[in-house]
């Protein structure tokens, strides 16, 4: 028993930093862990049900191609933010069920994993574990985890990037046999788990770190080869998600503007609350909270830069990130020069994690050198700190923050500044490194208290106890399935409110999410379909009191036959007015036999060629086989009026079977497995070579 207790104590001491990070996570996200709270808004919206649908209707290696339940039907490959390819989602969906409570618990786990990754990364840049712990603690309170808690991709990107940067550190990537496969897997998950804008900023951040690492590395060739393998193999694996979209870019807009930037109105959130009535815009797109420690150390950092040029690198990265986060002519220039940066819709949230990482390392490197500064330098730093306080007071009053908010902010900053002074005094008086680490640990504890209090005052964006938020009308897990396949034909689609619609109404109606669970067929939904030509062309129609194409899509499964595609809207009108008498082509008869989620079966008899128009959404994923007397021919669908699915049918007596198949499915999986093999085989070869050389 005594040995067991001793072993437990030794383990606790050995991993005390990780235990502290776990404790912080449990305290902050205790209501996630209890299952009584989740992030609000989008977390329970499209992102929740898209991930539910991915594993309800398919699996990782056999993903669904088509979701018929919302927006008149949508292809899976178009939903770049669905999160189904994120492996932790697979684990939860398969073993725990993808309920809101479990999704929130997963998010808490991921944030813990991200902070542990940053701890490992910090140890490369600072001299001892306590400083690394300080970095990990600050990263645990990354604004991405709180202001953007509803956005799965933003959080997951911020979780994974520290791990990838950690794997890229020269000593680890060269000396650890598992570094390449682990790095490939992490980059693959970064590709599939991040929003596109976050992914691009993460790749640029990795590139910047690569040049930093290789500058100080003697074994540059060995290092560069290993990094190249990680990113090449990870990219090949990630194309399982992106290849169909990349080869269908013609369906998407090419010029994307930055619709969420860092401006004066939200710049105040670097220290003030981001959930406040005096601010404008989406509260989840505001926060750049830096924490009190960095702000108090700014004056000292100015002097430390003269002695530690490494800080200049981080300062440069801060300014680069800021440029990408704001809207300016310089930003537009960078977006026009740097490939793929122009796809960023939300510059502030896309580049904020890079900005935050830089801020943390400036903080750590400054703190590490703080005891080397002269007394005069520290006095000057305190005078500059007073100027910073005046600047913060001016911002608070000009933006109409309450007196209590301004007063509390000053108390936090002054208390932090006093703790820094006490640490400096301790570093002079205490010669024992262990004793000084205890003082630093107390500074860390004070910062933890301030961070927790700050985010508890800003819970609107990251904690809601209305787990189902009235979106479903009942709890997520109690909604019964109504539709069971196969059907003879598709039932009418459900439009919850009559047109006309304003843009926000047809783009952001959460209520349609329940149809993913019931299996019914919703007309609209809160999903990112606005960029696809087929869906974008419906927007003007939804803004009318009545439109033939919308009405046609709403009806139960229906076929119009025609000889050409002239006056299609008139034909649709006649079809709907004349009691669905729509097969007007003589000697052409169509009968539906079966309707399934991703397939349809018809019997077709015709003495002439004709066009078959379905009241279904067009997507290039849909193709068909026409079989007559065991001889089959494949045909592809094509769009009419940009949105409707049409087929050119030759004369004959056929069994017509249409099926949704994701484009380039064989090619993307072939590339995925080649990337996996590249990662594993290169690991074996390079480690054998390294062993021989050593």
Task: Name each region found by the language model.
Residues 24-115, 137-159, 249-250, 258-284, ...:
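Membrane-interface coil-to-helix junctions
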Residues 159, 172-175, 180-185, 198, ...:
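Contiguous transmembrane helix-bundle modules in multi-pass membrane proteins
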Residues 405-410, 447-609, 613-620, 626-632:
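Extracytoplasmic
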Residues 21, 112-124, 129-215, 226-246, ...:
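Membrane-embedded helix bundles of polyisoprenyl
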Residues 4, 8-78, 458-466, 471-512:
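Hydrophobic alpha-helical membrane-insertion signals
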Residues 79-87, 263-304, 310-311, 345-363, ...:
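Alpha-helical transmembrane segments at the extracellular/periplasmic loop-to-helix junctions
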Residues 26-35, 58, 87, 92, ...:
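Membrane-interface helix-loop junctions at the exits of transmembrane helices
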Residues 10, 323, 579-694:
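Active-site-proximal, structured, solvent-exposed surfaces of multi-pass membrane proteins
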């Amino acid at each position: 028993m005594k040995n067991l207790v001793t072993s437990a104590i030794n383990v606790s001491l050995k991993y005390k930093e990780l235990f502290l990070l776990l404790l912080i996570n449990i305290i902050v996200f205790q209501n996630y862990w209890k299952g009584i709270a989740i992030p609000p808004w989008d977390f329970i919206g499209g992102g929740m049900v898209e991930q539910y649908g991915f594993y309800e209707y398919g699996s990782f290696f056999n993903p669904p191609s088509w979701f018929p339940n919302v927006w008149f039907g949508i292809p899976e490959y178009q939903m770049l933010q669905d999160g189904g390819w994120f492996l932790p989602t697979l684990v939860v969906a398969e073993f725990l069920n993808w309920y809101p409570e479990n999704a929130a618990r997963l998010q808490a786990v991921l944030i813990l994993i991200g902070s542990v990754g940053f701890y490992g990364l910090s140890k490369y840049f600072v001299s001892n574990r306590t400083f690394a712990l300080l970095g990990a603690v600050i990263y645990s309170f990354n604004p991405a985890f709180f202001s953007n808690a509803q956005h799965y991709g933003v959080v997951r990107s911020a979780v994974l990037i520290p791990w990838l940067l950690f794997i890229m550190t020269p000593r680890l990537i060269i000396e650890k046999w598992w570094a390449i496969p682990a790095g490939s897997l992490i980059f693959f998950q970064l590709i599939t788990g991040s929003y596109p804008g976050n992914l691009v900023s993460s790749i640029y951040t990795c590139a910047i770190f690569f040049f930093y690492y290789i500058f100080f590395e003697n074994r540059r060739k060995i290092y560069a080869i290993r990094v190249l393998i990680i990113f090449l193999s990870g990219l090949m694996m990630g194309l399982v998600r992106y290849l169909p979209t990349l080869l269908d870019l013609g369906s998407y807009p090419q010029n994307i503007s930055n619709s969420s930037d860092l401006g004066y109105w939200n710049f105040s959130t670097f220290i003030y609350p981001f959930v406040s009535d005096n601010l404008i815009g989406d509260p989840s797109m505001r926060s750049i909270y830096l924490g009190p420690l960095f702000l108090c150390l700014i004056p000292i950092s100015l002097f430390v830069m003269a002695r530690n040029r490494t800080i200049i690198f981080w300062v440069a990265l801060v300014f680069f990130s800021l440029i990408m986060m704001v809207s300016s002519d310089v930003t537009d220039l960078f977006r026009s020069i740097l490939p793929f940066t122009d796809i960023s819709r939300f510059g502030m949230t896309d580049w904020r994690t890079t900005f935050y990482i830089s801020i943390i390392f400036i903080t750590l490197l400054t703190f590490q050198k703080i005891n080397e500064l002269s007394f005069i330098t520290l006095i000057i730093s305190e005078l500059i700190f007073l100027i910073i306080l005046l600047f913060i007071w001016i911002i608070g009053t000009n933006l109409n923050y309450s007196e209590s908010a301004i007063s509390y902010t000053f108390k936090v900053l002054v208390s932090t500044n006093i703790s820094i002074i006490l640490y400096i005094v301790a570093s002079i008086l205490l010669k024992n490194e262990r004793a000084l680490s205890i003082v630093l640990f107390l500074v860390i504890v004070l910062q933890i208290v301030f961070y927790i209090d700050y985010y508890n005052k800003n819970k609107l964006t990251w904690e809601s106890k209305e787990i189902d938020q009235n979106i479903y009308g009942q709890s997520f897990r109690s909604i019964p399935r109504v539709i069971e396949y196969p059907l003879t034909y598709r039932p009418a689609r459900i439009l919850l409110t009559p047109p006309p619609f304003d843009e926000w109404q047809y783009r952001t109606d959460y209520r349609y999410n329940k149809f993913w669970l019931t299996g019914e067929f919703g007309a609209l939904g809160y999903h990112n379909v606005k960029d696809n030509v087929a869906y974008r062309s419906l927007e003007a129609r939804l803004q009318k009191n009545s439109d033939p194409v919308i009405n046609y899509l709403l009806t139960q499964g229906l076929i119009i036959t025609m000889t050409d595609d002239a006056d299609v809207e008139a034909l649709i009108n006649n079809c709907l007015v004349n009691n669905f008498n729509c097969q007007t082509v003589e000697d052409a008869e169509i009968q539906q036999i079966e309707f399934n989620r991703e397939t349809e079966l018809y019997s077709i008899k015709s003495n002439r060629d004709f066009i078959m128009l379905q009241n279904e959404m067009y997507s290039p994923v849909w193709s068909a086989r026409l079989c007559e007397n065991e001889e089959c021919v494949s045909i592809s669908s094509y769009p009419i009026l940009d949105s409707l699915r049409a087929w050119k049918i030759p004369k004959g007596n056929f069994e017509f079977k249409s099926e949704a198949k994701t484009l380039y499915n064989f090619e993307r999986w072939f590339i995925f497995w080649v990337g996996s093999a590249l990662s594993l085989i290169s690991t074996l070869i390079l480690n054998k070579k390294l062993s021989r050389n050593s």
